């Protein structure tokens, strides 16, 4: 058995206590021949900070890029950055060009890189694309692109928000192949103009959001499992025709409970793991598509407290995915309003209280969700 032994003195900790019990030594044995988790990527998302940071002076941009992406050390041996292995890039839907008519707040509007004529416009999303290039320059090996909404010229309400609609995909019923062509052209444009290869594409972000993407917060659309499957099949066909090796990631769920059952939505946007990856789900099974990763993706919101619940749902999801031969990826996390333990997500908090809270969620995702 290969082991590593770490001996840590407890004197520093004990000195801060009212009554020290003397010098004690703790010994930890790490069994490196018995791995418990496999970490494929450690990444972060660009939405929406990089639309601003990407316009800063070049020296400041490079400093931020080093913090995020660098695996180098300075002369003193101190790491320059955290060495992310994946960068998650948002392909915009065009709410920025609509301005106030978009019904979306300015900070989360995005430009659209592919116009109604089907051509890639290299003048669009330049700030966000700058960080794609900076990531590649620093050796980030993988790029995941995702969409919150189809482009506004393909949606039913001609908006990138779902306001005024129900719980179905905001896409014209005859525009599925056009949407797949849009995504494919965006991927090809990033390769041509920025020398950036998109390894993974997530065509529908959080389609099960129980709020149905209503209101001014951001771009977004719901989608039923049947609609998700139809989008995936059309995109798989388009990627194949274009000769692209990009893999499709589904379903980027907003709530892990929607992957395993019905939660605050109807049956059409529930049980997503079985719907998309069980061969018994003949209408919605996407496992035969050449480009589809055998992966179910979700976001670590709404299931983080209490601790027992956080642990149990991740174990249930891990086991259910294994039975179907599918891996689980956690692809998004930030502080939300339900995180009452640390103040509900408003404002800024650089204290260890918030840091430890986030670390606990990451720990549970890795250890129990694998």
Each language-model region and where it sits:
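Catalytic metal-binding/acid-base residues of hydrolase active sites
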Residues: 207-208, 254, 297, 301-302, ...
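Glycine-rich tight-turn/loop motif centered on a GG-T
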Residues: 169-170, 217-223
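Catalytic-core region of carbohydrate-active enzymes that cleave or remodel glycosidic bonds
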Residues: 300-370
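Bacterial N-terminal signal peptides that target proteins for export
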Residues: 1-9
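Function-critical acidic carboxylates
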Residues: 204
């Amino acid at each position: 058995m290969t082991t590593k032994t770490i001996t840590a003195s407890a004197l520093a900790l004990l000195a801060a206590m009212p009554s020290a019990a003397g010098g004690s030594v703790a010994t930890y044995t790490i069994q490196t021949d018995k791995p418990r988790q496999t970490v494929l990527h450690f990444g972060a998302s660009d939405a929406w900070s990089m639309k601003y940071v990407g316009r800063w002076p070049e020296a400041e941009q490079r400093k931020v890029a080093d913090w995020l992406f660098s695996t180098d050390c300075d002369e003193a041996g101190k790491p320059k950055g955290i060495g992310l292995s994946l960068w998650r890039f948002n392909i915009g839907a065009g709410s920025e060009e609509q301005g106030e008519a978009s019904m979306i707040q300015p900070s989360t509007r995005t430009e659209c890189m592919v116009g109604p004529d089907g051509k890639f416009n290299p003048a669009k999303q330049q700030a966000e694309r700058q960080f794609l290039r900076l990531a590649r320059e620093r050796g980030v090996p993988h790029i995941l692109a995702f969409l919150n909404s189809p482009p506004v010229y393909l949606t039913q309400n001609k908006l990138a928000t779902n306001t005024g609609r129900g719980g179905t995909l905001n896409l014209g019923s005859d525009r599925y192949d056009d949407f797949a062509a849009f995504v494919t052209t965006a991927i090809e444009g990033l390769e041509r103009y920025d020398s950036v290869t998109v390894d993974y594409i997530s065509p529908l972000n959080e389609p099960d959001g129980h709020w149905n993407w209503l209101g001014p917060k951001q771009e977004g659309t719901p989608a039923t499992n049947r609609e998700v499957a139809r989008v995936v099949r059309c995109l798989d066909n388009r990627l194949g025709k274009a000769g692209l090796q990009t893999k499709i990631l589904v379903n980027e769920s907003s709530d892990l409970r929607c992957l395993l059952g019905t939660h605050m939505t109807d049956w059409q946007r529930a049980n997503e793991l079985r719907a998309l990856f069980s061969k018994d789900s003949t209408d919605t099974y996407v496992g035969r598509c050449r480009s589809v990763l055998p992966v179910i993706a979700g976001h670590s919101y709404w299931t983080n407290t209490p601790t027992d619940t956080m642990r149990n749902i991740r174990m249930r999801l891990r086991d259910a995915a294994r039975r179907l031969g599918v891996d689980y990826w956690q692809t998004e996390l930030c502080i939300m309003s339900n995180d009452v333990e640390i103040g509900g997500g408003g404002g800024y908090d650089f204290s260890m209280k918030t840091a430890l809270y986030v670390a606990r969620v990451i720990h549970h995702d890795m250890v129990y969700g694998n």
